[in-house]
């Protein structure tokens, strides 16, 4: 099955990070979510109950990123993936990519970040 739902470029303000500046000032986190889902049922029925409502996924991700602080974005990504996999039974696999576009570290780059993939048990 190669069907996916994706939510790319979601931008949220949060206070995640190891450095004091990240906790005090905060920063924008760019989150991309890719969900492996069998979309054939929704393709036939034209009914949202046969898919994953990405509006609801957006609200969930927003709540997590704008909620309690994580020191590591690895931990933040795990929280997101775990929530999605436990709340959406149609999801077979969740990929979470988190980018910090302007972390308080020296250098020139478009962003730094992580990506995890977690299967739904």
UniProtKB/Swiss-Prot annotation:
The keyword Isomerase applies. Belongs to the DHNA family. Transmembrane segments: none annotated. Substrate binds at residues 22, 54, 73-74. Pathway: Cofactor biosynthesis; tetrahydrofolate biosynthesis; 2-amino-4-hydroxy-6-hydroxymethyl-7,8-dihydropteridine diphosphate from 7,8-dihydroneopterin triphosphate: step 3/4. It catalyses: 7,8-dihydroneopterin = 6-hydroxymethyl-7,8-dihydropterin + glycolaldehyde; 7,8-dihydroneopterin = 7,8-dihydromonapterin. GO terms for biological process: folic acid biosynthetic process; tetrahydrofolate biosynthetic process. The active site is at 100 (proton donor/acceptor). Its EC number is 4.1.2.25, 5.1.99.8. This is Dihydroneopterin aldolase. Homooctamer. Four molecules assemble into a ring, and two rings come together to give a cylinder with a hole of at least 13 a diameter. Gene3D superfamilies: 3.30.1130.10. Catalyzes the conversion of 7,8-dihydroneopterin to 6-hydroxymethyl-7,8-dihydropterin. Can also catalyze the epimerization of carbon 2' of dihydroneopterin to dihydromonapterin. One of its GO terms (molecular function) is dihydroneopterin aldolase activity. It comes from Staphylococcus epidermidis (strain ATCC 35984 / DSM 28319 / BCRC 17069 / CCUG 31568 / BM 3577 / RP62A).
């Amino acid at each position: 099955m190669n069907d996916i739902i994706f939510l790319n470029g979601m931008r949220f303000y949060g206070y995640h990070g190891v450095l004091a500046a990240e906790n005090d000032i905060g920063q924008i986190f760019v989150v991309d979510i890719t969900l492996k889902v069998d979309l054939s049922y929704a393709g036939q029925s034209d009914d949202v109950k046969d898919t994953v409502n990405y509006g609801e996924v957006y609200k969930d991700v927003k709540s997590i990123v704008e909620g309690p602080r994580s020191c590591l974005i690895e931990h933040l990504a795990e929280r997101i993936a775990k929530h999605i996999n436990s709340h959406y039974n149609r999801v077979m696999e969740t990929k979470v990519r988190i980018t910090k576009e302007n972390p308080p570290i020296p250098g020139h780059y478009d962003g730094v970040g992580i990506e995890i993939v977690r299967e739904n048990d």
